[in-house]
């Protein structure tokens, strides 16, 4: 099974001024992110505004990004949903686009119990021949997949190869203490990157790497080299950026940050709205203070 890389970016979806998906810009953004140090890209995840993309748009995005960078880095398709049968169908369709793996979010809104989570993920993963990464984000889904459920899936389903985890460090430690060999954990929260690494996480599926990819690469490389003081210094320097990008709902400020740093990707789609002038100015100050502007 592939490792996918330590620094992955949850890619935004570029839009034209009238709100259509800008596929050409998506290919350009993919190349831009790879040049900035990303070892893999997650397409049509939360940051990619997946709830407001049609299946047809998502499939074309997968094809676009695979064509642009699939020969260089891993491309992971966000195909999870709260409908098991639909997630199976869509995951099979996505597999035919040439992606290297799937990201499967915990079912949201219907709030399944732990046994429901187990059966859902097992059914989806066993329906495809691609490696699957689970995605636990309780703040978005209102359900927390417990470590025991994650570990059960890791042991029982060979192509479930890792998890993007957004719970606290204690939950991460519980997962890592019982994980089978080769099972990877990526932080799903930029602000938790260094704490997660110290407990044993493999890397991060990042949002901030849209604008501070090289710096995050420096942080990870310093940690892996045993230079924890340098890694901590990078973490402290980048923490205001991590926090600033999430001052309002993601990906509103990530798209604003890309515009401010000279790589515009268009607006967000309703029901999200673009950053206000005040929000953008506050973000500009954060980016300038961090040396990004």
Curated annotation (Swiss-Prot):
SMART domains: DHDPS
Entry keyword set: Amino-acid biosynthesis, Cytoplasm, Diaminopimelate biosynthesis, Lyase, Lysine biosynthesis, Schiff base
UniProt-annotated catalytic positions: 135 (proton donor/acceptor), 164 (schiff-base intermediate with substrate)
Location(s) in or outside the cell: Cytoplasm
Enzyme class: lyase
Known catalytic reactions: L-aspartate 4-semialdehyde + pyruvate = (2S,4S)-4-hydroxy-2,3,4,5-tetrahydrodipicolinate + H2O + H(+)
CDD domains from the UniProt entry: DHDPS
Residues reported to bind pyruvate: 47, 205
InterPro entries: Aldolase_TIM, DapA, DapA-like, Schiff_base-form_aldolases_AS, Schiff_base-form_aldolases_CS
GO molecular function (one): 4-hydroxy-tetrahydrodipicolinate synthase activity
HAMAP family reported for this sequence: DapA
Record PANTHER family: 4-HYDROXY-2-OXOGLUTARATE ALDOLASE, MITOCHONDRIAL (PTHR12128:SF66), DIHYDRODIPICOLINATE SYNTHASE (PTHR12128)
Name listed for the protein in its UniProt record: 4-hydroxy-tetrahydrodipicolinate synthase
Source organism of the structure: Symbiobacterium thermophilum (strain DSM 24528 / JCM 14929 / IAM 14863 / T)
Gene: dapA
């Amino acid at each position: 099974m592939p490792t996918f890389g330590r620094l992955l970016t949850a890619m935004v979806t570029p839009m034209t001024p009238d709100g259509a998906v800008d596929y050409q810009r998506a290919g350009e953004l993919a190349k831009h992110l790879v040049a900035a140090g990303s070892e893999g890209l997650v397409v049509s995840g939360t940051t990619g505004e997946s709830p407001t993309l049609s299946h047809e748009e998502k499939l074309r995005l997968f094809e676009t990004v695979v064509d642009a960078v699939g020969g260089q880095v891993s491309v992971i398709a966000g195909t999870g949903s709260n409908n098991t049968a639909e997630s199976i169908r869509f995951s099979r369709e996505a597999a035919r686009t040439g992606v290297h793996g799937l990201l499967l979010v915990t079912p949201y809104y219907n709030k399944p119990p732990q046994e429901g989570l187990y059966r859902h993920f097992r059914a989806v993963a066993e329906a495809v021949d691609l490696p699957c990464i689970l995605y636990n984000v309780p703040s978005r889904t209102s359900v927390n997949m417990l470590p025991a459920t994650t570990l059960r899936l890791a042991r029982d389903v060979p192509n479930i190869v890792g998890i993007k985890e957004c719970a606290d460090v204690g939950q991460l430690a519980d997962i890592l203490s019982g994980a089978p060999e080769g099972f990877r954990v990526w932080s799903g929260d930029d602000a938790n990157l260094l704490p997660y690494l110290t407990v044993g996480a493999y890397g991060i599926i990042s949002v901030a790497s849209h604008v501070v990819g090289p710096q995050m690469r420096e942080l990870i490389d310093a940690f892996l080299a045993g230079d924890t003081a340098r890694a901590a210094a990078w973490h402290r320097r980048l923490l205001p950026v991590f926090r600033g990008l999430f001052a309002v709902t993601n990906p509103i400020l990530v798209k604003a940050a890309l515009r401010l740093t000279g790589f515009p990707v268009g607006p967000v789609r309703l029901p999200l709205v673009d950053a206000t002038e005040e929000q953008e100015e506050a973000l500009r100050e954060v980016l300038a203070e961090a040396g990004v502007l």
